[in-house]
Amino acid sequence: MMKLLLVVATSVALIFSVTDLSGEGPKHGGESMLTVQIPDFRLIPTTGALGPESFVFDFFGDGPYTGLSDGRIVKWLANESRWIDFAVTTSAREGCEGPHEHQRTEHVCGRPLGLAFDKSTGDLYIADAYMGLLKVGPTGGVATQVLPRELNEALRFTNSLDINPRTGVVYFTDSSSVYQRRNYIGAMMSGDKTGRLMKYDNTKQVTTLLSNLAFVNGVALSQNGDYLLVVETAMCRILRYWLNETSVKSQSHDNYEIFAEGLPGFPDNIKRSPRGGFWVGLNTKHSKLTKFAMSNAWLGRAALGLPVDWMKVHSVWARYNGNGMAVRLSEDSGVILEVFEGKNENKWISISEVEEKDGTLWVGSVNTPFAGMYKI
């Protein structure tokens, strides 16, 4: 009985830690850059769905574009201050629109997460959690699969992507080979390490660059294209994967090394900042109890066998106890330079991404029915 209580208590701590109010602060010495106040911060509702996870601007600087929980990709019209439909990730749209719990239908309707434009063609590439790696032309519409069917079906949880503008190579992540997005808490609790970093090149070949990753998430190419930064959410760290073996500058395992670790929360997406370095969205802060739970995966696996809907538990808790933030890391050493977080009543449920464009921070969250816009 005592062992069962320990399992339940620790598992609840792990679930709640995704929104833990006692989260630890940054350890890299960054000062808080922004204390968000309502007059400074604009919330932009995403009509009909929620979860603007990631942002991207097109070749002309228009947008941003973002994917939503009902499978749509929408475009922001700045002059009209409204979103318009741009694309969908599947033509099977029956039952996808309108107010309902989209998590129950996202495996049918699609859930677009990472987005990136191929600037040479104008095509928008999409990492859809269920439909795999997709693309749609400059005028939008229904996206089509990029990979052969058998390869696309092998992707269990396509999450993020980036494109080399010089070569057209697409780098993308598959968060788990076991768990799908609608049960991502299971991947976190179980200690799953089946995530992969992959690439799709001009010869239409798919290559696995890294495997055995713990909930691999965001990916970003460096400014000069010599390395990738890859987020391991469950490990609260970021890896640097060198694309050119001659570029390795330190003692690393194979051709990757730890770029940043001990982050103050669970990292999600990562994007380059035009001011240098990388913005990392931290879904939520964590605590010492979180670290204990994450380092004892057997507890989480045991809890998954209990008759509890852990996704529902997490969803309800997160709704009322948000604690998201974002950090900007230095390009060379991964040191925290700036911190973005709300204060008091303006705390975020979660932050999945910060995209910086023309002096504005676009803030995304997989859980909210709005995007945030902050003028620096």
Curated annotation (Swiss-Prot):
Record keyword Isomerase present: no
Signal sequence, renumbered to the chain: 1-23
Glycosylation sites: N79, N244
Keywords in alphabetical order: Glycoprotein, Signal, Vacuole
Subcellular location: Vacuole
GO cellular component, one term: vacuole
InterPro entries associated with the record: 6-blade_b-propeller_TolB-like, Strictosidine_synth_cons-reg
Highest taxon, organism lineage: Eukaryota
Family, similarity comment: Belongs to the strictosidine synthase family.
Name of the protein: Protein STRICTOSIDINE SYNTHASE-LIKE 2
Gene encoding the protein: SSL2
